[in-house]
Structure formats: structure tokens, C-alpha cells
Amino acid sequence: MQVKDQLSSLQPYKPGKSPEQMKEVYGDHSFVKLASNENPFGCSPRVLDELQKSWLDHALYPDGGATTLRQTIANKLHVKMEQVLCGSGLDEVIQMISRAVLKAGDNIVTAEATFPQYRHHAIIEGCEVKEVALNNGVYDLDEISSVVDNNTKIVWICNPNNPTGTYVNDRKLTQFIEGISENTLIVIDEAYYEYVTAKDFPETLPLLEKHKNILVLRTFSKAYGLASFRIGYAIGQEELIEKLNVVRLPFNVSSLAQKAATIAFGDDEFIEEIVRVNTEGLRQYESFCKENEIPFYQSQTNFIFLPVENGGEIYEACAHAGFIIRPFPNGVRITVGTREQNEGVISVLQQHFENKKRKSRDEANA
């Protein structure tokens, strides 16, 4: 049986190991998952209360257009309902965009170290992928602009960026957008938008009024704590959203997910508290890194990235202590947890780096 040739160069997405899978390797004790940037505090209590009270007819298909949820999003963000597209997580939204826009001979431009699904779906559609190195962990928009050409159909900007947690500020993003042809779609992935505290972070929704080639992506999987429900959304001009709806699967978001997201979107107090606690958690890690001269990227998300050598060793040390983090070739990414969880990981990091220093001293004196 024949499939697309380009599939031979790709692998299925491999998520981080679950606590159950970790037990098979590291022993039968409890594990704290801090690898996938989920909300360690769960979702709004209102969601749990309402879902217990409500009744859904599970024999019926969901509202294919997610009308109530889209209207709720539109009302809060001051856009039209027709400007909102919902998907089964941002993964599906990214797939929809790629399928609708890309064809063989096109190219996309993005960063080297960023969310891998941009690249994945471009290759599936037979496109060239142009990746630009980060500049100190941040998207280099000047360099990205220099490699955009007439065949560039999408520029993907993850802001704040995953896995580094860094961001492009308002001035740089606005300047970049002004220099890109409206024939090129600029997708700004703001999955971690709710966690941002930087004063100069871009407010992208007003840009939609002036630029027809911008899409903004957000999700309920992170700050809202609804990752298992799989729901994300895009906001853009009506004409573009209408075309993306053509490739959207019928009934793509379950009734349960729509209801949970609608309730969660109205609980501003919950999000404010989550952001407050998350900011405190980031300060825990930042203080530790500064005191011990360990490099880190200033994060605007619910995780912190340490650009260090031997990320695999740090992963192993954390795993043996009951913490699941995400290793990378050039460092580790750690989801911010509860205060106690953060203290536990920091204790492991402290021991790891002390052992490393001791080993270096011993080798120097040998």
C-alpha cells in the first residue's frame, strides 16, 4: 500500500512518560509529572461542580460549530463569533491550518527550537521547512524575515516560546508583521498567554482589524487545566476562519469539552490565582539558579528551561527522586508545580550540580 513518501522521514509524536510507565523503569513509587506543562492545580472548581450537576445526552453528536463556546470566547475577547474556530486541542488547529494553506512547493518559516507540530504538518503536506536559530532563546524575527520568500505560505511564531519560555515583545512583533506580505499567513501561537506578566507582551487581537493574514491561537490545556478535554481555538478575520472551517472535522469537539471550556472561561478569579502561584513558583527556580550560577531563560510561561549540558543526567536524577521532567539535547524543561514539588526538584538539582562541581575539582586535582 502506498502512502506519502514524506511520511518515511517522520515519527509519531512521543509524549513524555506517564507515572505508570515510569514505575516500570524506576520502581514502584509515586511520581510527579512535571514534563508536559499541565496545570498542577487542575481546573476551576466551577467546572467540576457544573459537570456533576449537568446531564448530557451521550447518544447525540455535539454541536459541530461549538456555538455557545465560540460566542462565549467572542464576547469576552470583543470579537465576532464568526472570527473564532475551535479544535480538538491546538494540535488539531495546527493540522487544519496546514491542510488548508500548504501544498507541495510551498515553505514555512519558524524557529529551530519551538513546538514541533509546525514542522511535522508542513512536511506531511510536502513543504520545505525553513528553521531559524533562536537568539539567546528568543525568536529572531529579523533573521526569520530575511528568509521569507514568495513561496513562504506560513510563518509560525510561538509566543511565549515552547520550550524556552521566552517571548517577542510588542515593538518587535509589530515591526515584523508590517514587513511581511499579506500573502503570507502569520500564525501566533499563544498557548501560554494567560501566564504572561511582561508589560511589553504583544496584544495581538487588535492587530486582526488591520491585518487579514494573522491568526492567533490559544488553548484551554494550560492555565485552564483542561488538557484531557482537548480544546483549543483560533481567532482571525471572518473570511479566513470560514475557509478553515471547510477542513474542520464534523463534530470535532465533544459536548463535554465544550461545556467545560465554556464554564472555565468565565472564572477569572481562578486564572488570577493560578498566575499568582505560578509566578511565585518561577521565582523559586530563578532564585535557585541565580544563587548557584546555573543558566536559565526568563520565562513567561508555566515552565522554566535550563540550557545546560547533560540534560539526560538531570532527567535521570529527577526520575529516581520521583519527578518527571522533559530532557532536551541542550537542556531540560521543568513544569512549575506546587511549592512543595518545586522544592523537591530544586533539591535534586542542587545535589546534581554539587556533585558535578565536586567531580570537576577531583579531576583537576588528580
Swiss-Prot record:
Post-translational modification N6-(pyridoxal phosphate)lysine, affected residues: K222
Keyword Transferase: yes
Biased composition (Polar residues): 1-11
GO MF annotation terms: histidinol-phosphate transaminase activity; pyridoxal phosphate binding
GO biological process entries: L-histidine biosynthetic process
Region described as Disordered: 1-21
Pathway(s) per entry: Amino-acid biosynthesis; L-histidine biosynthesis; L-histidine from 5-phospho-alpha-D-ribose 1-diphosphate: step 7/9
Pfam families in alphabetical order: Aminotran_1_2
Family named by the database record: Belongs to the class-II pyridoxal-phosphate-dependent aminotransferase family. Histidinol-phosphate aminotransferase subfamily.
NCBIfam families on file: hisC
Protein name: Histidinol-phosphate aminotransferase 2
Lineage, broadest ranks: Bacteria, Bacillati, Bacillota, Bacilli, Bacillales
Gene name of this polypeptide: hisC2
